[in-house]
């Protein structure tokens, strides 16, 4: 058993061990390990996040103090948003001189990231459900002046019914009225332009809740395309792309999506934060509203007849399209297999299984970039790197 896999001493964490039995590791962070655990009185399964505030003895006293304060702040925010159906629920907390134990609901479906890896890309319908729930969470957070600062598919969990639960509030903070942030933290490919600018310009006024909306746009783009909107093998060039808002809807996947969904993505990925969509504005976008209207509409007899008539017309059109459609020949498949949607999805799925990573299909597209995000990446010296 490695040091990372070793469990905290049962004597120093007696209260935790009296109530819970830790099991296998589910995930790791820079200074934490997440394990499945069993609540002894009820035999209920939970997930426990074990945070080593000493970094295994490698942290300085100042770093230990900062991590302890950050963990207490995370616990405080989780308690303030407790009860929201799409936010992970904190069940129990335990503290020793060296460790924190945070007990959460166990999400057996795992991360949205893993689901995307399996599915390659998501449909507009699936994306709509996920993004609506995420935006409702962000609305709640922002009304409380809480900014998450680390929104990404890895921090969105799924329950058995495919409902999302936002997790990992380690970078979150509650702003005072008029307060602006300057700390550079987050995951590189999800960073908003103003966060990067803060690291390069001492006179920058700082950033606010708008950074969450940029990350939301990156998430939505990634769910639909299967790859992030901003990527370059050299990180500083990728950060340049972010700062200039240089992205495209150029990959073949976008041919299958509506202009409405592309419009919403573009409303998030706006370089100037004051012009970026808020969560409330996004929920009022036609991408969501057109389906809300349909959900509450009551059918009248006339409406039922109209549906039947349209169904008959659609059936006739499908029949004639079927009679006219050109067969897919061997030559077409050999010449451009990626132009055919079923083959495209099949190729993507098997490429991952064969090579262990997604296959790059263009200069601006690389699914392997999804796997380059290290947990809890803190960027402290962007300004010192060469352009």
Swiss-Prot record:
The two calmodulin-binding domains appear to act in concert to bind a single molecule of calmodulin and are pseudosubstrate/autoinhibitory domains. GO terms for cellular component: cytoplasm; cytosol; phosphorylase kinase complex. Keywords: ATP-binding, Calmodulin-binding, Carbohydrate metabolism, Glycogen metabolism, Kinase, Muscle protein, Nucleotide-binding, Serine/threonine-protein kinase, Transferase. One of its GO terms (molecular function) is protein serine kinase activity. Residues 303-327 are annotated as: Calmodulin-binding (domain-N). Residues 20-288 form the Protein kinase domain. This is Phosphorylase b kinase gamma catalytic chain, skeletal muscle/heart isoform. The keyword Lyase does not apply. ATP binds at residues 26-34, 49. It comes from Homo sapiens. The active site is at 150 (proton acceptor). It catalyses: 2 ATP + phosphorylase b = 2 ADP + phosphorylase a; L-seryl-[tau protein] + ATP = O-phospho-L-seryl-[tau protein] + ADP + H(+); L-threonyl-[tau protein] + ATP = O-phospho-L-threonyl-[tau protein] + ADP + H(+); L-seryl-[protein] + ATP = O-phospho-L-seryl-[protein] + ADP + H(+). InterPro entries: Kinase-like_dom_sf, Phosph_kin_gamma, Prot_kinase_dom, Protein_kinase_ATP_BS, Ser/Thr_kinase_AS.
């Amino acid at each position: 058993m490695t040091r990372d896999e070793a469990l905290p001493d049962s004597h120093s964490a007696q209260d935790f061990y009296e109530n819970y039995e830790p099991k296998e590791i589910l995930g790791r962070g820079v200074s934490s390990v997440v394990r499945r655990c069993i609540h002894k009185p009820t035999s209920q399964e939970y997930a426990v996040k074990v945070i080593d505030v000493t970094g295994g003895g490698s942290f300085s006293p100042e770093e230990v103090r900062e991590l302890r304060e950050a963990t207490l702040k995370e616990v405080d925010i989780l308690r303030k948003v407790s009860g929201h159906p799409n936010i992970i629920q904190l069940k129990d907390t335990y503290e020793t001189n060296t460790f924190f134990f945070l007990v959460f609901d166990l999400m057996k479906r795992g991360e949205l990231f893993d689901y995307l890896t399996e599915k390659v890309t998501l449909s507009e319908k699936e994306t709509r459900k996920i993004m609506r729930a995420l935006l409702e969470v962000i609305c709640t957070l922002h009304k409380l002046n809480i900014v998450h600062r680390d929104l990404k598919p890895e921090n969105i969990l799924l329950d058995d019914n495919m409902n999302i639960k936002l997790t990992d509030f380690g970078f979150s903070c509650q702003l005072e009225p008029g307060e602006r942030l300057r700390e550079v933290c987050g995951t590189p490919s999800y960073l908003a332009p103003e966060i990067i600018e803060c690291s390069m310009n001492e006179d920058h006024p700082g950033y606010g809740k708008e950074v969450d909306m940029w990350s939301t746009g990156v998430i939505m783009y990634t769910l639909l395309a299967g790859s992030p909107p901003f990527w370059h093998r050299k990180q500083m060039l990728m950060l340049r792309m972010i700062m200039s808002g240089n992205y495209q809807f150029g990959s073949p996947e976008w041919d299958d999506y509506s202009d409405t969904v592309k419009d919403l993505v573009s409303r998030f990925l706006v370089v100037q934060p004051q012009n970026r969509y808020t969560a409330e504005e996004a929920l009022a976008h036609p991408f969501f509203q057109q389906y809300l209207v349909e959900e509450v509409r009551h059918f009248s007899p006339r409406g039922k007849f109209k549906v039947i008539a349209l169904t008959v017309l659609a059936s006739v059109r499908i029949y004639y399209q079927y009679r006219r459609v050109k067969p897919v020949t061997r030559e077409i498949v050999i010449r451009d297999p990626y132009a055919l949607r079923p083959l495209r999805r099949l190729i993507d799925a098997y490429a991952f299984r064969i090579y262990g990573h997604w296959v790059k299909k263009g200069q601006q597209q690389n699914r392997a970039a999804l796997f380059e995000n290290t947990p809890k990446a803190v960027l402290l010296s962007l300004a010192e790197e060469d352009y």
